[in-house]
From Swiss-Prot:
It comes from the Eukaryota. The gene is TXNDC17. Belongs to the thioredoxin family. Keywords: Acetylation, Cytoplasm, Disulfide bond, Redox-active center. This is Thioredoxin domain-containing protein 17. Disulfide reductase. May participate in various redox reactions through the reversible oxidation of its active center dithiol to a disulfide and catalyze dithiol-disulfide exchange reactions. Modulates TNF-alpha signaling and NF-kappa-B activation. Has peroxidase activity and may contribute to the elimination of cellular hydrogen peroxide. Interacts with TRXR1 and DYNLL1/DNCL1. The modification N-acetylalanine is found at residue 2. The record marks 44-45 as: Contributes to redox potential value. Residues 41-123 form the Thioredoxin domain. It is found in: Cytoplasm.
């Protein structure tokens, strides 16, 4: 049995619903460029960071929730008025954050295993 629950969502509305459904739990969210039918993201940094983030999940506390969120296609993401930028202050992908706290890793920080591990293991 997994020590944590993983939820995969696409878009801001699904992300918001997932957060509401897991209210009261510690939530980590990973924001990444959406993948095409072949499973390839338009965001090269996201492709590089994903295995580092996946490895870091070994350090997540029991009972936490990990939300894997695809932010949409590149034109939507680049719009300064998209919901992720306006409502969550997520301004770059990849971004890994502990929801409801100022703790977050942005872009190249998501490639640093020690930082990812630290984010997941802090209480």
């Amino acid at each position: 049995m997994a020590r944590y629950e993983e939820v995969s969502v696409s878009g801001f509305e699904e992300f918001h619903r997932a957060v509401e459904q897991h209210n009261g739990k510690t939530i980590f969210a990973y924001f990444t460029g959406s993948k095409d039918a072949g499973g390839k993201s338009w965001c090269p940094d996201c492709v590089q960071a994903e295995p580092v983030v996946r490895e870091g999940l070994k350090h997540i506390s029991e009972g936490c929730v990990f939300i894997y969120c695809q932010v949409g296609e590149k034109p939507y993401w680049k719009d300064p008025n998209n919901d992720f930028r306006k409502n969550l202050k997520v301004t770059a992908v990849p971004t890994l954050l502990k929801y409801g706290t100022p703790q977050k890793l942005v872009e190249s920080e998501c490639l640093q295993a020690n930082l990812v591990e630290m984010l997941f293991s802090e209480d």
